[in-house]
Swiss-Prot record:
Any one Gene Ontology cellular component term annotated for this protein: ATP-binding cassette (ABC) transporter complex
GO biological processes: cobalt ion transport
Molecular function terms from GO: ATP binding; ATP hydrolysis activity; ATPase-coupled transmembrane transporter activity
Official protein name in the record: Energy-coupling factor transporter ATP-binding protein EcfA
PROSITE patterns the record matches: ABC_TRANSPORTER_1, ABC_TRANSPORTER_2, CBIO
UniProt superkingdom: Archaea
Organism: Methanothermobacter thermautotrophicus (strain ATCC 29096 / DSM 1053 / JCM 10044 / NBRC 100330 / Delta H)
Amino acid sequence: MIELRDLSYSYPDGTPALRGINMKVERGERVAVIGPNGAGKSTLFLHLNGILKPAAGEVIIDGERVDYSKDELIKIRQKVGIVFQNPDDQLFSPTVREDVAFGPMNLGLPEDEVEERVAESLEKVGMSGYENRAPHHLSGGEKKRVAIAGILAMKPEIMVLDEPTTGLDPETADGIIRILLELSREGITVMISSHDVEIISQFAERVFVLNSGELIAEGTPLEIFRDAELIRRASLRLPRTADLLNRLRMAGFEVDVKLTVEETYHELLHLLGGDAYHRLLHFLGEEKQHRLIHLLGEKKYHELLHALKEQ
């Protein structure tokens, strides 16, 4: 579906931005590209539909090398849709309807089909009824949804979203991830970039790690976040669940790293040994007990302690 071969790119001042990137994303996959700010994630994504042209290497879409001719770029941009990190870079029409209709209208589609695509796209992102609102009056999360709808209206096969949850509160960010998961279930290939490790386990099937313009690792979320040294080298942090279990493991507890709260709860419940209740409280101390309550929720935390005490 998408393949990058030895892709390199430098900024106009000569500073290297991407160095020899090799990456392959299959049809229908959910992929995350993670790395710290300045790792090259946004620059990488701008190569996926021809906004940027590599200094060296190739971009291959559906087995065909992108040749950057005008006709080729039009075709690629119908197939690969990019949602920018800042929705204000993408929303410029007086109303939501006009913004979402912009792409289909430029394809020369009949008016009734344009209206159908607008209605369908807004419904998918939960923004039906906002057609006549001004985009600049919307909240950050609403703007992000409208920006996604504008790309959906083009009916792309591949959705590429640069930092889709940046600047959003947790509830709004979770809503964006739910939209992307639903699009994946419909068969759309979805790629996101992020330096927020917490959303990766909710979303990704495969993770690529970028640092200083180089691809330094690839694997499942669990494979990536089990490697605490890799995460340190990439100037990231472990998800809270993985960090807790990794700290417990380093303290001598026989636990395996998990990513979800439910898996973490059961790992603590079933794998801690007979004197685990007292060992756990001693290890945590008051401050870390509060962190564990925040992580698991108060009910599950007390269920866990009760179960350990009964062992």
